[in-house]
UniProtKB/Swiss-Prot annotation:
Cellular component annotations (GO), alphabetically ordered: plasma membrane; side of membrane
Disulfide bond sites: 88-122
Gene designation per UniProt: ENODL7
Annotated protein name in UniProt: Early nodulin-like protein 7
Main location class: membrane
Length: 192
C-alpha cells in the first residue's frame, strides 16, 4: 500500500514539474515578429471595419526587441509622431517605406504611431498605434478601450504599475515552487 502511494505521488510530482517548466518557458519567450493585421495585412480597412488595426493591436502584447512586418501592395507605411497620427499627416515622417514589405524594430518602450502614406487611406482607418511594454511591465487596459486608443495621460499611480509588474514577474517562480513544495510534503506524508 505504501509503495503504491509513493509511486502515485512521484507521478503527480513529475507531472506538476513538467507543467511548471512549460509555463516557465512560455514566460521566457524571446523577441517576436508580428505581421500587422495578420491575414488582413496592411491595407485600407473595409468601410464598416475602420477599427481593424485597433483590434489587432489590442489582441497582441509588444515588447522591446519585437518587430512589426507590414505587407502591402501599392501603398506605403510611415512611422509618425502623435500629431501626425491624429491628423493623418505624413509630411515629416520618422521613417517611411513603400517597398511592399517593411519591417520596423520596436527598440524602446512606449507608443509607436504608424499611418499609410496616402491621406485618404489613413482617414479611412489605415493607421495603427502600438504600445511597447517596459521590461516586466504588466499593463491592464480598460476592456472597452484597446491599447491603441487608450488615454495617453500618465496619471496612474507608479505604485500600482510597480505592484502589477512584480506580481506578473513572480508567476514563473511560483509555478516552479509549487512542485517543490508538493514533493517535500509528499515525502513528509510517506515518512509517517
Amino acid at each position: 500500500m505504501m509503495m503504491m502511494m509513493m509511486r502515485s505521488t512521484c507521478n503527480l510530482t513529475l507531472m506538476l514539474c513538467i507543467c511548471a517548466l512549460v509555463v516557465a518557458s512560455m514566460a521566457a519567450e524571446g523577441p517576436r515578429d508580428f505581421k500587422v493585421g495578420d491575414e488582413f495585412g496592411w491595407r485600407v480597412p473595409l468601410q464598416n471595419d475602420s477599427a481593424v488595426y485597433s483590434h489587432w493591436a489590442s489582441s497582441n502584447r509588444f515588447h522591446i526587441g519585437d518587430s512589426l512586418s507590414f505587407v502591402y501592395d501599392k501603398d506605403s507605411v510611415m512611422e509618425v509622431d502623435k500629431w501626425g497620427f491624429y491628423h493623418c499627416n505624413g509630411s515629416d515622417p520618422i521613417t517611411a517605406f513603400d517597398n511592399g514589405n517593411s519591417t520596423f524594430d520596436l527598440d524602446r518602450p512606449g507608443l509607436f504611431y504608424f499611418i499609410s502614406g496616402s491621406n485618404q487611406h489613413c482617414t479611412s482607418g489605415q493607421r495603427l498605434i502600438v504600445e511597447v511594454m517596459h521590461i516586466h511591465q504588466h499593463h491592464d487596459h480598460d476592456a472597452s478601450m484597446p491599447p491603441s486608443m487608450s488615454p495617453l495621460s500618465n496619471s496612474a499611480s507608479p505604485y500600482a504599475s510597480a505592484s502589477a509588474s512584480s506580481a506578473a514577474s513572480s508567476l514563473p517562480t511560483a509555478c516552479l515552487l509549487i512542485p517543490l513544495f508538493l514533493t517535500i510534503a509528499s515525502f513528509r506524508f510517506i515518512s509517517y
